[in-house]
Amino acid sequence: MAAKDEKFGNEARIKMLRGVNVLADAVKVTLGPKGRNVVLDKSFGAPSITKDGVSVAREIELEDKFENMGAQMVKEVASKANDAAGDGTTTATLLAQSIVNEGLKAVAAGMNPMDLKRGIDKAVISAVEELKNLSVPCSDSKAITQVGTISANADEKVGALIAEAMEKVGNDGVITVEEGTGLQNELEVVKGMQFDRGYLSPYFINKPETGVVELENPYILMADKKISNVREMLPILESVAKSGKPLLIISEDLEGEALATLVVNSMRGIVKVAAVKAPGFGDRRKAMLQDISVLTGGSVISEELAMDLEKSTLEDLGQAKRVVINKDTTTIIGGVGEKQAIQSRISQIRQEIQEATSDYDKEKLNERLAKLSGGVAVLKVGAATEVEMKEKKARVEDALHATRAAVEEGVVAGGGVALVRVAGKISNLRGHNEDQNVGIRVALRAMEAPLRQIVSNSGEEPSVVTNNVKDGKGNYGYNAATDEYGDMIDFGILDPTKVTRSALQYAASVAGLMITTECMVTDLPKEDKTSDASSSPAGGMGGMGGMM
């Protein structure tokens, strides 16, 4: 086991504080409409430029191990806020820095660290309740645009694009961000249910100019099994041929004579047919087949349910207005399933999302939810260079997370005003002793930090502006972009309540633990063991040279 280095008391806390300040000072320059960029060096390729707090935080590692421990703990604040709400990382870092700085001053002055932490926790619990009271719902397109604009560093086009995407696919719809090929941002919306399985044979293509299969008002056969024997399909093929409608077959696999027969029938025009593999694997494939059956009003032919493909009828088949298949994807548009059944399935998936423990499972369940409830929107980010592309993509992703958070829990006045108002409302809060009261004051002072930093980054005097805002009421605040005072809601400066709440809670949680730290332990640096020159191969060669 490696030897350890230890530091105690004030010496440990000073080291930790230095690390906190190094990281927070690098992150906080990005805050607000006039926040600056940070350039991050990469081990290969061009440096990246960002205004995203968590991206800056992740890059910081300090040489001194004790200082680095302080920096890593604040990095945890930024990461947690990012995971919870997708934004607010800079605010969370700033709040943590303020609480740690003010808290450690109080500890140095002789206050009890545990009582300080209790006071901070008490203030944060009350502040969260007040934030909920200040919050207003964010449901209309205008408010969503404003939230997206603020989070995308005052880029109105990004805000409008996100609002348009949410309008088209619904609040539960999947919106993904990709790198585009042009200079302009683009929005691509896929209506209906799309899954990543293409046609099993190019001979099914009936639109050679575009290389796709298009089926109008088709029947849809869903089978949770491999189909290789053509005989078990003959009854259903004959029924479909008599109806004059096309047929889409979705199965675990289709091979051998079954596939060959379908291709021949399709090419001769006897029955218009196409086949694709079922999406997903294992249990997820069964669930997705069930989703398709609910959407199209059919049944999944499954041997587990003692259903026989040979005995299936037209009533077992689903239907849709249109199906489009290319070599990679299948899109089912206008499924004729009952609305009540679809809503019931959506509720079931929502319940599964709440119970899911892994991020991967949640992501896949959200994709299924979106495909059932509306569709998928793809935001394609345009830029002139790769460096700009990466920076812009990160901003768009932040804005998307912020708008989702706003729809979920509502919005409050932005620009640091909400926390200042909350601090004013709970200024009379008291603890069980004077040390707890100091902890409460530490938290209240920290709630002013975001406003002070926004003002500082815009080149104005923080104390003057903060006092002016504190003297105002309601949504009255300072617009750093235009250097004027007024109603922040009217200015369109909004923050999602969830983002502000998460930032405050995670900052107080980690900062409270740091204030109560009394000892820090880390590995001692390993010494380089250099071999003696006399034992090196070169020494031996020298001896040989002397013999000659």
Curated annotation (Swiss-Prot):
It catalyses: ATP + H2O + a folded polypeptide = ADP + phosphate + an unfolded polypeptide. It is found in: Cytoplasm. Pfam families: Cpn60_TCP1 (PF00118). Residues 539-548 have a biased composition (Gly residues). It is an enzyme of class 5 (isomerase). Its main location: cytoplasm. Keywords: ATP-binding, Chaperone, Cytoplasm, Isomerase, Nucleotide-binding. It comes from the Bacteria. ATP binds at residues 30-33, 51, 87-91, 415, 479-481, 495. One of its GO terms (molecular function) is unfolded protein binding. Signal peptide: none annotated. Residues 525-548 are annotated as: Disordered. The keyword ATP-binding applies. Its EC number is 5.6.1.7. InterPro entries: Chaperonin_Cpn60_CS, Cpn60/GroEL, Cpn60/GroEL/TCP-1, GroEL-like_apical_dom_sf, GROEL-like_equatorial_sf, TCP-1-like_intermed_sf. GO terms for biological process: protein refolding. One of its GO terms (cellular component) is cytoplasm. Forms a cylinder of 14 subunits composed of two heptameric rings stacked back-to-back. Interacts with the co-chaperonin GroES. Belongs to the chaperonin (HSP60) family. Together with its co-chaperonin GroES, plays an essential role in assisting protein folding. The GroEL-GroES system forms a nano-cage that allows encapsulation of the non-native substrate proteins and provides a physical environment optimized to promote and accelerate protein folding. This is Chaperonin GroEL. It comes from Buchnera aphidicola subsp. Rhopalosiphum maidis.
